[in-house]
């Protein structure tokens, strides 16, 4: 009902920025701790998003899970695609999504991750959450490449509009 009527509650964004890293542990090495605040609308600076993305994005492969580790994960890449879309970084979102397509197997399944120094899939699994993240990212992207610009049919466009209004 909220999205349909376009009535968005006002969140205390400052409070969420303060509480996001409440335990004091430095999580700057994990990509999800970079893009989740953007995904949630806690942060919304496009330049900051792009600067932080440089620490994790390996062009041609996807988004690393951990900054210092030589592996990309498909779920993190897909979630980062959605974060990029919400904050008007459509070209980057499309690049990342296109990068991960090479990892889809003949059955249409994506692996959890790829260790690029050793050129192996790691961990050796095809997790359901990874494949769900790819589907959600594909849904989000599909509306940016079509003639349908109705934000009411795309939850991610609704999120972008919501975050811009707060």
Identify the role of each PLM range.
Residues 3-73, 95-166:
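Extended glycan-interaction surfaces of carbohydrate-active proteins
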């Amino acid at each position: 009902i909220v999205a349909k009527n376009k009535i968005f509650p006002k969140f205390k964004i400052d409070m969420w920025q303060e509480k996001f890293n409440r335990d004091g542990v430095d999580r700057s090495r994990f990509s999800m701790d970079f893009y989740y605040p953007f995904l949630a609308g806690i942060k919304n600076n496009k330049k900051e998003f792009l600067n932080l993305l440089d620490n994790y994005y390996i062009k041609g492969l996807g988004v690393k899970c951990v900054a210092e580790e030589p592996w990309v994960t498909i779920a993190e890449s897909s979630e980062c695609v959605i974060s990029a879309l919400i904050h008007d970084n459509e070209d980057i979102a499309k690049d990342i999504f296109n990068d991960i397509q090479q990892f889809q197997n003949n059955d249409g399944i994506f692996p959890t991750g790829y260790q690029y120094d050793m050129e192996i899939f790691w961990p050796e699994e095809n997790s359901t959450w990874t494949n769900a993240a790819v589907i959600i990212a594909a849904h989000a992207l599909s509306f940016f490449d079509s003639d349908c610009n109705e934000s009411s049919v795309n939850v991610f466009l609704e999120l972008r509009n919501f975050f811009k209004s707060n």
